[in-house]
Design a protein with these regions (language model features):
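ATP/NTP phosphate-donor binding region
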Residues: 1-48, 52, 60, 64, ...
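Gly/Ser/Thr-rich active-site loops/lids in small-molecule metabolic enzymes
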Residues: 150-194
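Catalytic core of DAGKc-family lipid kinases
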Residues: 80-155
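A residue-level signal for conserved active-site and pocket-lining positions in enzyme catalytic cores
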Residues: 15, 50, 76, 126, ...
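Proline-centered loop/turn at the N-terminus of a beta-strand
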Residues: 69-71
Length: 264
């Protein structure tokens, strides 16, 4: 894990315009001024990105700072907040600690999605499903160049460790602990008793081909449509070269979050 350091500059990232979030922005700015920390824009080479919002805001911040070695720490103003490190009433005490480097920084892998001759990064997950609501699709798939067959299903999810606790988990996929350099492949409602999720390491890319004779497949990357596959067209997904960085208070470990969100 990268060694944390004292913070000189921060960027405040929020996509929520509620009054309580606007008030939180002012609180962060006052705290930063009191501690001699400069508040800069997202392009101002910050040492830390402070995100005010939920997991969706965290994902957008991760995308913004991918490959920059800028860690992202979150204050939860959303619902679940699995990726955030503190709630609103902990903002001052938590950020005071972050400003002096009292955080743990976790580096996490991303996905490289290749569709239609273009590459896109995914922080959370990739989902391929029918372009027509409620329709089953037939997907051919291979891992590491080895053909694994054609499967009728409602779709397939490929998730990072960071994204494994989202849609993947809801569909019976395993949770990947932070720190693993792997991705998980989980089918949605497969018409087979023998298909199980797969945990795949680096250099074992997933290739999914639309084998549905009369329908297209929509590919969704981190909740945004990335393209469509006509019959016979593929999408390839593998672990990417870019990494993201999550800053967290040391006691807010992965298993602390897991126990609170899923095991209690």
């Amino acid at each position: 894990m990268p060694s944390p350091k004292a913070v000189e500059r921060i960027a405040i990232v929020t996509h929520n315009h509620e009054p309580r979030v606007a008030d939180a922005v002012a609180r962060v700015e006052r705290l930063a001024e009191a501690k001699g920390v400069e508040v800069t824009g997202e392009d101002g080479r910050p040492d830390l990105a402070v995100t005010l919002g939920g997991d969706g805001s965290m994902l957008r911040a991760f995308h913004r700072f991918l490959g920059t070695d800028v860690p992202v720490i979150g204050v939860n103003f959303g619902r679940v907040g699995f990726l955030t490190s503190m709630v609103a009433n902990e903002l001052e005490t938590g950020l005071e600690r972050a400003f002096v480097g009292d955080v743990t920084v976790v580096r996490f892998p991303t996905l490289d999605v290749r569709i239609g001759g273009q590459n896109r990064p995914a922080v959370n997950d990739v989902f391929a499903t029918s372009s027509r609501l409620g329709r089953m699709v037939e997907l051919g798939y291979s891992v590491g160049g080895e053909d694994l067959g054609v499967l009728p299903c409602d779709g397939v999810i490929c998730a990072t460790p960071l994204g494994s606790t989202a849609y993947n988990l809801s569909n019976g996929g395993p949770v990947l602990v932070w720190g693993l350099d792997a991705m998980v492949i989980t089918f949605v409602a497969p018409h087979s008793l023998h298909v199980r999720p797969l945990v795949v390491p680096h250099m074992r890319d997933l290739c999914v081909t639309n084998k549905t004779p009369d329908g297209s497949v929509t590919v969704i990357v981190d909740g945004q449509e990335a393209g469509r596959l006509e019959p016979g067209e593929p999408v390839e997904v593998g672990l990417g070269a870019q990494t993201g960085m999550l800053a967290t208070l040391p006691e807010r470990t992965f298993f602390t979050r897991y126990r609170k969100a899923f095991a209690s």
